[in-house]
A protein has these predicted regions:
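Short alpha-helical segments that sit at the start of domains
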Residues: 2-30
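Short, cationic-aromatic polyanion-contact patches
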Residues: 17-24, 75-101
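Short acidic, hydrophobic short linear motifs in intrinsically disordered regions
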Residues: 38-48
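Short beta-strand(s) of the beta-wing in winged-helix/HTH DNA-binding folds
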Residues: 39, 70-72, 90
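Short coil turns linking two alpha-helices in DNA-binding domains
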Residues: 52-58
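Short, hydrophobic-biased segments on the C-terminal half of alpha helices
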Residues: 58-62, 80
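A short, conserved structural fragment
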Residues: 65-77
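Amphipathic alpha-helical dimerization/coiled-coil segments
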Residues: 93-137
Length: 137
C-alpha cells in the first residue's frame, strides 16, 4: 500500500532512522563504534555520557537491543574475572547493515581516532576497556 508518505516499508524505515538518530541513542551507537573493540561495557557507556543518568543510558541501550540494532554479549562463566565486566554491547550485523545503508557509519574511523586521543579516562575505565571480551580467549 502506498500513501503520500510512501509505502509501509518506507515509513518503517524512516521511523527506524528517526529512532536510531534520537540524540541519546545515536550517542550510544557512536560510543560503540568508537570503542577499540566495538564492545563497551555498560560502565564505559555511562562514563562516556556524563550528562545522561545511568538509568537513561541503560534504558536506551535496551531500546536499541529491542530494535535489533544492538546486542548484548557476555563472557562465558569460565572466562569471567572478579572485578571486571562480563557483559558488553555491540552492533548486530543487521544493525550495522542498516546504519551503513543509511550512511550513518560515515564517521566511524574519525570516532575511533577521537576516542584514542582521550587522555583523562578514569583508571576504572581503562581497566574495563582492556578487559577480556567474548572471542578474545
Amino acid at each position: 500500500m502506498s500513501t503520500d508518505l510512501g509505502t509501509a516499508e518506507e515509513m518503517e524505515t524512516r521511523e527506524l532512522v528517526h529512532f536510531v538518530t534520537q540524540q541519546t541513542r545515536f550517542a550510544l551507537i557512536n560510543n560503540i563504534l568508537q570503542h577499540p573493540e566495538q564492545l563497551p561495557s555498560m560502565y564505559e557507556l555511562e562514563e562516556l555520557n556524563p550528562s545522561v543518568s545511568d538509568a537513561t543510558v541503560y534504558k536506551h541501550i535496551q531500546k536499541l537491543i529491542d530494535a535489533g540494532i544492538v546486542k548484548e554479549v557476555a563472557l562465558d562463566d569460565d572466562q569471567r574475572r572478579q572485578g571486571y565486566p562480563w557483559k558488553f554491547y555491540g552492533l548486530t550485523d543487521e544493525g550495522r547493515a542498516f546504519l551503513e545503508e543509511h550512511n550513518l557509519l560515515a564517521a566511524e574511523e574519525t570516532l575511533q581516532q577521537i576516542y584514542d586521543t582521550i587522555s583523562d579516562k578514569p583508571e576504572k575505565m581503562v581497566k574495563y576497556e582492556n578487559a577480556p571480551r567474548p572471542g578474545d580467549v
